[in-house]
Amino acid sequence: MSRKLISLVQPNFQQGPKEYNAHYLPYSVGVLWAYVNQFDSIKTNYQLEDLIWRRDNIEDTVAKLSRCDIVGFSTYVWNKNYNYTLARKVKELNPDCMIFFGGPEMPITKSDIFKKLPFIDVVIKSEGEIILRQLLDAISDNTSWFDIKGLLINKDSQAVDTGNGDRISNLEDLPSPYLTGVFDKIMSEVTDVEWNATVETNRGCPYACTFCDWGSLTYNKVKKFGLEKVFAELEWIGQNKCGFVTITDANFGMFVERDNAIADKLIAVQEQYGCPNSFSMSWAKDQKPEVFDIVFKLIKNPKFNQGLTVSVQSMDLDVLENIKRKNLAQHKIENIFALCDKNNVPVYTEIILGLPGETVSTWKEGFYKIFRAGNHTGTNILQAQMLENAEMNLLQEKLFKITSVPVYDYMSGSYNYNELEECVSVVTSTKDMSMEEMLDSQIFSWFMQTFHINGLTTYISRFLHKKAGVDYSEFYNKLWQYLIEDPWFVAEQDAVRMYYRNWMTVGKINHPNISNIEIHGWNIIHRTTLHMHKDRRYEYVFDLIERFVTNEFELDSNCLNQLLLFQKNYVINYNDISKFPYTVEFNYDFLGYILDDTALETSVKYNFEFHESKDISLDRFLENIYFGRKRNFGKTLITKESV
């Protein structure tokens, strides 16, 4: 008897700068096949035909998949429309092909799911490994699917729910797709791609944030993979020259001793094989002091200089209560930021605009709270999204009068979406923030990103805050009032407002390239910074800043002039990168005074360094404003020596 052909589909966009041609190996479907293929009943009855990992031409892909008896799709926000189109066309060409779907973006709570998606035969609602094996065995044994828990079955366009499936009790039962050769075929066939890899060291999240579907989809309880397997996978990643690795733990650092060992292994692999070149992870929400040992350890490797992410989401207590999120106490956040500041560790704070209960005033105050707490180098401003299975989408939409719109150029990598556009459902208003107020908040975020977070006025405002008691709210209110009289600033502000309005009205930002850089929802907030480099506007903008500070604040002229010089040298101007590194002597120790409370009037030499290649092209430099934000790209590394 011939074996049934099965293909598994998990396409993604190209990742990062175009020149890397970087793509993720399809881990989610890979781990499914690694699990089921260890059983004789599967090996005897099924043959894996294809793994679809890239958004290739739809008709070519349909032609391949239509030969199969079964096609399974792993569905996320970045591949949903592509997957639906692919599945529909396969079903049209081969009605006997069984179509399985799973993944976080499946509308499993919607009773009309199969009326809208009639080409799908069955949806796996949760963890897929055990359920997929049971389903495949039922097909080969010709037994009923309805006895398998964890499915939505399409019965004459009606959804039959078989209940909740069992969660995997022991993650040791899951073989590695890397170590069992699941990806060997595609890696041998495709040689012009830099592969990205995904590693699960544990599975689950103990939190229930309403904007996120992580905790709900993983049943909250955290289970761990064996360290031996994790280490072997990291070794494989290094040996196979994977350029980037994502550790998918919801809270890396939660298990301090274990995660320290994983960090040690990651460093050892990078040093031995030269790969991976970079990594990403979601750090533990409740960050203990021991977590910093892991961060400092990683950042000593020049490839791993992303620093620490502190995901606060909002700085307002009412908003946090609405989203079922509890942040670290303010004094703990301040200690974290101070520790990172003094040790030159980039620190990165994530906040989300559009959460239930957020107002324009609380949103603005949130930035000032972050600055007062001590984070000045990195704040990532995200727009709230309505994820399919998140509580905010399922239960809170009516309660908080949340409106949203599908935005089709929100994600990076959209330059290779071909004719099938993917969208993100972006929040545009709530009962606490109208659409116009949302626009005002987006403009304020752009203003903070351009001037404080990207470095143009960071040390000026920090110095005035400490020396003269000028609160950040006062400084930036005055700066806004000053700049709003300038034609260049007004033009930039009007343009950014127009592009943000575009996504609320037509679902696309529709921004032209800056140089050769695609502008989308993730990086439009950096638009002005990109233009300043491309159009050589830095001198003009610093002249504006100098006149503003001189007119608004009373400072000793010598101190003021040197403060402005220090500030100007903090920010890297693309047109001046050939002069790095260099040293400048000052009569005032601004860095020591701000960070360590040392005497201000102290002679000191500051060394300003640019830790990237000075041969970097303008396009690559502009790309790194966004892609390098976690390593504080665009700002100098400052060290000092006494005179």
Which sequence ranges carry the predicted segments?
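Conserved C-terminal portion of the radical SAM core fold
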Residues: 70-72, 234-248, 274, 278-282, ...
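Short hydrophobic segments within beta-strands
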Residues: 9-12, 74, 102, 248
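Glycine-rich beta-alpha loop elements in corrinoid/cobalamin-binding modules
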Residues: 4, 35, 44-168
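Glycine- and acidic-residue-enriched helix-capping/strand-helix junction motifs
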Residues: 15-30
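N-terminal [4Fe-4S]-dependent radical SAM core
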Residues: 1-7, 13-14, 154-198
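Radical SAM enzyme core and accessory elements
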Residues: 2-8, 17-18, 41-45, 63, ...
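Hydrophobic positions in alpha-helices of CheY-like receiver
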Residues: 36, 89-90, 266, 336, ...
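Radical SAM [4Fe-4S] cluster-binding motif and immediate context
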Residues: 24, 177-342
